[in-house]
Curated annotation (Swiss-Prot):
GO (cellular component) term, any one: cytosolic large ribosomal subunit
Descriptive protein name: Large ribosomal subunit protein uL22
Family that this chain belongs to: Belongs to the universal ribosomal protein uL22 family.
Family matches, as InterPro entries: Ribosomal_uL22, Ribosomal_uL22_bac/chlpt-type, Ribosomal_uL22_bac/org-type, Ribosomal_uL22_sf
Organism domain of life: Bacteria
GO biological process: translation
Keywords attached to this entry: Ribonucleoprotein, Ribosomal protein, RNA-binding, rRNA-binding
Length: 113
């Protein structure tokens, strides 16, 4: 049995989020949350939030045991890019890109495999 959680429109670049995800991929849920707690990246907080949500979905919707949950699949997709204008000298302007990310976490019961 699997449970899934998705956090959409997170204001961080997908590349930065994927660096954090690579650390916790395949870990037990509790160990992954403990690891993310001590990471300084802003993306670690968002990934931890999504993992907690997936674990809560597994417990509430499927009556799965939290101790046996592990991160089966975790990935970050690119969301829409917010485009802003920064005025420059002599009437010119530069475009500022503010990327967003969609974070997806799937947790499964390790005892089933």
């Amino acid at each position: 049995m699997e449970a899934k959680a998705v956090t959409r429109y997170v204001r961080i670049s997908p590349l930065k989020v994927r660096l954090v995800m690579d650390v916790v991929r395949g870990m037990n849920v509790d160990r992954a949350l403990a690891t993310l707690r001590y990471m300084p990246q802003k993306a670690a907080r968002e990934v931890a939030r999504t993992i907690k949500s997936a674990a809560a979905n597994a417990e509430h919707n499927f009556d799965m045991d939290r101790e046996s949950l592990y991160i089966k699949t975790i990935y970050a997709d690119q969301g829409p890019v917010l485009k802003r204008i920064m005025p420059r000298a002599r009437g010119m302007a530069n475009r500022i890109r503010k990327p967003t990310t969609h974070i997806t976490v799937v947790v499964a019961d390790r005892s089933e495999y």
